[in-house]
Every structure is written in structure tokens, then in C-alpha cells.
């Protein structure tokens, strides 16, 4: 079985072909952009959802739905670069970075969880899966997945870790080999990454692409904050959140970004329509 399920090779435009030859790695083709989205209605939606279901919905869960919709709505960006060519993915999955604390040193580390087809998932189920998965990662109980492979890499000497990561990326993505037999999870990062820098108290920051993951999109969500807005000629205070995007220009360009922005704006413009009206969970009764 292959490492990732591919739908076939993408047909390249002249620019895309030139871009593949211009940038050799994910270190230099990064392009950046930010978007401010309104949050007043979204915060009301989160409050209503929590009241109706009891599930602790957060902005991160909604971003899972949004990014799933982005990958589904702009399939050209749901792609992976391998052997100098762009291949489209069959599956839709989003990776969320999770901050964890090393129990021995107390230092902060990064791991994460992968969510499949989040745009099609029921929000309550999505929240529960997040809570379960992130809890396992933070307790370092994910010994069959990404956390296990991360621990294994600690045995690699520092002088060889760069070469090792490049080799694993080549085998996993370049040659599309399933290395699960060696403890490397299949396609652990999906087609996009999201990291919540707002939880760290940051209003915003651009984060780098992760070269060995071959993921062409990483979104950083900033803190929800008050901002002055002009509405009907009057200055009003509204809740907003900024999204900071880093793209791999070998796969994504401005035309793709415009389509993605339209989807993101649509989701946050009317969250009750985009994410579904909150409904109380049915109460189980004994027959």
C-alpha cells in the first residue's frame, strides 16, 4: 500500500513548470499573506453551540471545518510535490500542531494530530475526537503514531538528523512508500497545517513551512481581539481574528489564494449557516 493516496499528476501551467525548477526546496518558495475575519457572530455561535450540546467548541475546531472546506473547494492546492512534479491528493486531511510539555525537562515541544475530512464531520464528534487525540498526545500515549516516530528520531545523532529527515521525506513522499512497518505513520500531516498562536498570547506571526512534511499550506490563527471598524460612517468596536498564511509558491499562487480567501470569508461571515445550527443532543432513555 502506498504512503498517501494520489488522484494523479496535476497538469502544469508554464509558470508552475518554471516554479518547480526555480525553487528546489520548501525553504525558499514561501509566500505570505494575512486575512482579518470578523468574530462577533462566530463567538455567538460558539456560545450557542456550547449551551446546546455541552461540547466545548473552540475556534480551532471551526478552523478544521474551514480548512477542510478550503481543500475541498480548491482541490489544486490539496497537493504534494514529489520528484519534481505536483500530484493531487485523493484524501482531505488537516494537521493541527499541539504544544506539549516534556515531563523530564519541562521544556515546550511540538507534536500534533491529523483530522480526516473535517468539513464533512459532525461538530460534536469533531470536538470529541480533538479532545481525545490531543489528550493522548499531551500524555504521550500516542505510541502507535506520530509521537512514537518522534521519539525514535531522538536516537539519531544531531549530525545526522538533517540527512535522516530528508531521507524519510524522500522515501515517504518522493517515492510514496508506506513505512508504517518501520513505525512511521502513513501520511501523518495531510494537505494543510494549522497552529494556534493566539493561545500563546500572540496577536499574529507568520510560521515557516515544514519541508519534510511536503505540506504546502500552514495557517497560524492569531488571538481574538477588539478592533475599530467603520460601519455606515461610524467607528465601532468589533471582535476580529487575523489569520497568517504561509504557502509553497511551487504549488500555490495568487489565484489559488483568492479562491481560498473567498471560502474562509464565507465561513466566518455567517457561521450559523456555514457550520450548522447548534442542536441539543438527544437524551438517552431506557427502553
Annotate each predicted stretch with a short phrase:
Residues 1-287:
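C-terminal catalytic/motor cores of large multi-domain enzyme assemblies
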Amino acid at each position: 500500500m502506498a504512503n498517501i493516496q494520489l488522484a494523479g499528476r496535476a497538469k502544469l501551467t508554464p509558470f508552475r513548470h518554471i516554479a518547480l525548477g526555480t525553487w528546489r526546496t520548501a525553504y525558499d518558495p514561501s509566500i505570505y499573506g494575512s486575512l482579518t475575519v470578523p468574530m462577533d457572530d462566530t463567538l455567538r455561535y460558539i456560545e450557542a453551540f456550547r449551551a446546546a450540546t455541552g461540547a466545548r467548541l473552540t475556534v480551532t475546531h471551526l478552523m478544521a471545518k474551514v480548512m477542510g472546506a478550503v481543500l475541498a473547494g480548491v482541490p489544486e492546492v490539496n497537493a504534494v510535490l514529489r520528484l519534481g512534479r505536483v500530484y493531487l491528493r485523493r484524501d482531505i486531511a488537516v494537521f493541527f500542531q499541539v504544544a506539549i510539555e516534556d515531563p523530564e525537562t519541562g521544556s515546550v515541544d511540538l507534536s500534533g494530530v491529523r483530522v480526516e475530512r473535517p468539513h464533512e464531520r459532525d461538530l460534536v464528534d469533531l470536538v470529541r475526537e480533538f479532545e481525545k487525540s490531543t489528550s493522548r498526545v499531551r500524555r504521550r500515549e500516542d505510541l502507535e503514531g506520530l509521537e512514537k516516530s518522534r521519539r525514535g528520531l531522538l536516537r539519531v545523532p544531531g549530525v545526522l538528523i538533517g540527512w535522516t529527515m530528508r531521507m524519510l521525506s524522500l522515501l515517504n513522499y518522493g517515492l510514496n512508500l508506506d513505512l508504517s512497518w518501520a513505525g512511521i505513520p502513513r501520511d501523518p500531516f495531510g494537505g494543510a497545517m494549522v497552529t494556534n498562536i493566539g493561545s500563546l498570547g500572540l496577536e499574529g506571526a507568520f510560521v515557516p513551512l515544514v519541508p519534510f512534511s511536503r505540506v504546502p499550506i500552514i495557517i497560524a490563527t492569531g488571538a481574538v481581539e477588539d478592533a475599530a471598524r467603520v460601519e455606515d460612517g461610524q467607528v465601532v468596536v468589533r471582535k476580529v481574528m487575523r489569520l497568517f498564511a504561509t504557502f509553497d509558491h511551487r504549488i500555490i499562487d495568487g489565484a489559488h489564494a483568492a479562491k481560498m480567501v473567498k471560502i474562509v470569508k464565507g465561513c466566518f461571515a455567517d457561521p450559523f449557516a456555514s457550520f450548522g445550527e447548534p442542536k441539543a443532543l438527544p437524551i438517552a432513555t431506557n427502553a
